[in-house]
Amino acid sequence: MPKASEIKKGFAIESNGKTLLVKDIEVTTPGGRGGAKIYKMRCTDLNTGARVDERYKSDDVVETVEMNKRAVVYSYADGDEHIFMDNEDYSQYTFKHNEVEDELLFINEDTQGIHLILINGSAVGIELPSSVELVIEETDPSIKGASASARTKPARFASGLVIQVPEYIATGDRVIINTTERKYMSRA
């Protein structure tokens, strides 16, 4: 069984008799020498859908749950539900908006590399690729000669995602975004 420091976003863990899907991990180091890092994991209870926070020290052993991944593409939205289609057998998987709302910020019809997470044969979540390519919907006008400065400005995408981009980026530019850190990487 892995230690808490080896757990990543998207892992399924077992805690207090509950099966949890790790949505986000926050690492803090308490003051003082030799203080072990504390991993605060924001999870979703796969049975109830409730959000659960778990805390572990870096050397705590965490019980993981075996899971399978299948390549899928975003198909369409139907009211409050979002449908993903399996790339191999074309079966469809439906998620409520609140179950995948964080992931939807990085997804459009062209997004490749999305994986469906299956535990005991049932779909429990989706995993994003490490980076995605999106088109900027709205940002302040670009400033000529600003490429040498490290100043940034907010940029909004069609999905509602807002991140900081360099000043020389303009509306309509295709950019590559790191999905785990929610940061601009480069122009596409």
Curated annotation (Swiss-Prot):
PANTHER family membership: ELONGATION FACTOR P, TRANSLATION ELONGATION FACTOR KOW-LIKE DOMAIN-CONTAINING PROTEIN
Designated name of the protein: Elongation factor P-like protein
UniProt record similarity statement: Belongs to the elongation factor P family.
SUPFAM superfamilies from the UniProt entry: Nucleic acid-binding proteins, Translation proteins SH3-like domain
GO biological process, one term: peptide biosynthetic process
NCBIfam families given in the database record: PRK00529.1, PRK04542.1, yeiP
CC annotations in GO: cytoplasm
Pfam families: EFP (PF01132), EFP_N (PF08207), Elong-fact-P_C (PF09285)
Protein origin, superkingdom: Bacteria
